[in-house]
A protein has these predicted regions:
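N-terminal domain-onset segments
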Residues: 1-86, 90-92, 96-198
Length: 198
């Protein structure tokens, strides 16, 4: 009985997180403008690019161990409900959310001495300081799409008007054969900046 209870507790220890913004594709067939496409495919650290637009800050929206939702399971190539380490943050410029970043990796890959062990201890430090200073990390090409902001998540995009679609991108970082997928959704306020030049 004790062993059964322990297995049940272990299975339930990874809570289910709501699907990320990028899991809500727009019903409209849209093509990004030249400026939008430049940002959606921009290499290098997005954090550094945002710092050029004003005073940068990071707000942690959600972080911890969760069970993979269907969308995240597909992105990582794992079974649904596989334990993941999830980190959702708002990247802000002048205290306004500009980008919503959703980072996921298999939980076992974030354990001590594993490929992404330092993910659990980033705090308010952007991931970019880790990802672009390690020559052992490889990044995939970007995939991008227009997405809708569901009612339950509009608090992360207060500048939205008339339910206008948002643009999002994602890519996969590999280290020691372990994946870290980062999905970045550009919020409405980002495009309202006087000069979000890529």
């Amino acid at each position: 009985m004790t062993n059964n209870r322990a297995r049940t507790e272990q299975a339930n220890s990874a809570l289910r997180i709501p699907s990320p913004l990028i899991a809500y594709p727009s019903a409209h067939r849209l093509q990004p403008s030249a400026q939008q496409h430049a940002w959606l495919t921009r290499p290098g650290s997005l954090t550094e690019a945002l710092k050029a637009l004003g005073t940068f800050s990071l707000t942690i929206m959600c972080e911890g161990k969760f069970a993979a939702c269907p969308h995240d399971a597909v992105l990582l190539g794992v079974e649904e409900r596989t334990p993941l380490w999830v980190r959702d943050v708002a990247l802000c410029v002048n205290d306004t959310p500009y980008v919503y970043a959703h980072s996921i990796s298999p939980y076992e890959a974030t354990e001590p001495l594993a490929a992404w062990s330092t993910l659990r201890y980033r705090g308010h430090e952007p991931l970019g300081t880790l990802l672009y200073n390690d020559t052992g990390i490889q990044r995939s090409a970007f995939s991008w799409q227009a997405v809708e902001c569901p009612d339950g998540m509009q608090h992360v995009n207060p500048a939205i008007k008339n339910g206008a679609p948002l643009w999002a991108r994602h890519s996969c970082f590999m280290r020691l054969k372990q994946p870290l997928v980062i999905a970045e959704t550009f919020l409405t306020a980002f495009w309202q900046h006087p000069s979000p030049q890529c």
